[in-house]
From Swiss-Prot:
The keyword Ribonucleoprotein does not apply. Belongs to the OMP decarboxylase family. Type 1 subfamily. GO terms for biological process: 'de novo' pyrimidine nucleobase biosynthetic process; 'de novo' UMP biosynthetic process. GO terms for molecular function: orotidine-5'-phosphate decarboxylase activity. This is Orotidine 5'-phosphate decarboxylase. Its EC number is 4.1.1.23. Coiled coil: none annotated. Gene3D superfamilies: Aldolase class I. PANTHER family: OROTIDINE 5'-PHOSPHATE DECARBOXYLASE. It catalyses: orotidine 5'-phosphate + H(+) = UMP + CO2. Pfam families: OMPdecase. GO terms for cellular component: cytosol.
C-alpha cells in the first residue's frame, strides 16, 4: 500500500491529509498556514470562509504554496453549476466539488466545463451523503435507503458522469473501491485521530482506519486547527499514516 502523487491534476504534495480551514477570521487561517509546510497537507476552504473573504483568500494561500480544495458543494441547474465549476478552475484550485444529488445532467455539465482546461483542470468530485447524516435524516427526506446504500448509488452515478471521485464517509470506502475501481478517488471527512471529539460528524474513523479502508484523501479540521500545537498534531497524523502505508 502506498500513496503516489495524483496524476490527474497538477499538485505540490503527495500527502493525503486535507486540513479544513474552519476559522471565523482570515488572520487566524493565514497564521495557521504560516506554521505548516505545504508539502505536509492540502487546505480546504468551505462556504463560510469563501463567502467572507472571497477568491483573493484562495490566491493568498496558493501563493504560500498550498493546493486548495474549494469545498462549495455546487448544487443548481446544470448551466449555473458548469459556470461555477469553470470559475473555480480559473482560480487554479486543486479540487472542486458538486452535490451528486443534483443529478447526471448537472454533473456532466460540470465535467464538460473543465474540458478546455486540459491538464490544468482541477479534480472534480461529488458529495454523496453528508457525514453528519444518519438513517433518520434520510427517512425525513423520503429516502428509504440506508446512508451506505444511498451513497453507493450516488457514487456510481458520479462515476458514470466522468467525475474523478466522491466525497463520502470512510465507512463506505472499501465498498466504493470494489464497485467504482481503485482509480476512483475517495475524499473523506469525519476523520478524527484517536481521542478527538466527534463534533457534528456522526460517522467517523481514525486516519489509520481510513487508510486501511481505502481512502485517498482525508479531511481533518478541528483536531488539527484547534490543537494546542497544530504543527505537531499534523506531523503525528502524517507519521501514523505513513506507518500504516509502510506496513500495509
Amino acid at each position: 500500500m502506498s500513496f503516489d502523487c495524483d496524476k490527474k491534476s497538477p499538485s505540490s504534495t503527495c500527502a493525503p491529509v486535507i486540513v479544513a480551514l474552519d476559522y471565523e477570521d482570515q488572520k487566524s487561517a493565514l497564521d495557521f498556514a504560516q506554521l505548516i509546510d505545504p508539502s505536509s497537507c492540502r487546505l480546504k476552504i468551505g462556504k463560510e470562509m469563501f463567502t467572507r473573504f472571497g477568491p483573493q483568500f484562495v490566491t493568498q494561500l496558493q501563493q504560500q504554496g498550498f493546493d486548495i480544495f474549494l469545498d462549495l458543494k455546487f448544487h443548481d441547474i446544470p448551466n449555473t453549476v458548469a459556470r461555477a465549476v469553470a470559475a473555480a478552475a480559473d482560480l487554479g484550485v486543486w479540487m472542486v466539488n458538486v452535490h451528486a444529488s443534483g443529478g447526471s445532467r448537472m454533473m456532466r455539465a460540470a465535467k464538460e466545463s473543465l474540458r478546455s482546461f486540459g491538464k490544468e483542470a482541477p479534480l472534480l468530485t461529488a458529495v454523496t451523503v453528508l457525514t453528519s447524516m444518519d438513517q433518520s435524516d434520510l427517512t425525513e427526506l423520503g429516502i428509504n435507503l440506508t446512508p451506505a446504500e444511498q451513497a453507493e448509488r450516488l457514487a456510481l452515478l458520479a462515476k458514470a458522469c466522468g467525475l474523478d471521485g466522491v466525497v463520502c464517509s470512510a465507512h463506505e470506502a472499501t465498498r466504493f473501491k470494489q464497485v467504482c475501481g481503485d482509480d476512483f478517488l475517495l475524499v473523506t471527512p469525519g476523520i478524527r485521530p484517536a481521542g478527538s471529539e466527534v463534533g457534528d460528524q456522526r460517522r467517523v474513523m481514525t486516519p489509520e482506519q481510513a487508510i486501511v479502508a481505502g481512502v485517498d484523501y482525508m479531511v481533518i479540521g478541528r483536531p488539527i486547527t484547534r490543537s494546542e500545537n497544530p504543527l505537531e498534531t499534523l506531523q503525528q497524523i502524517n507519521r501514523s499514516i505513513q506507518g500504516v502505508v509502510q506496513h500495509g
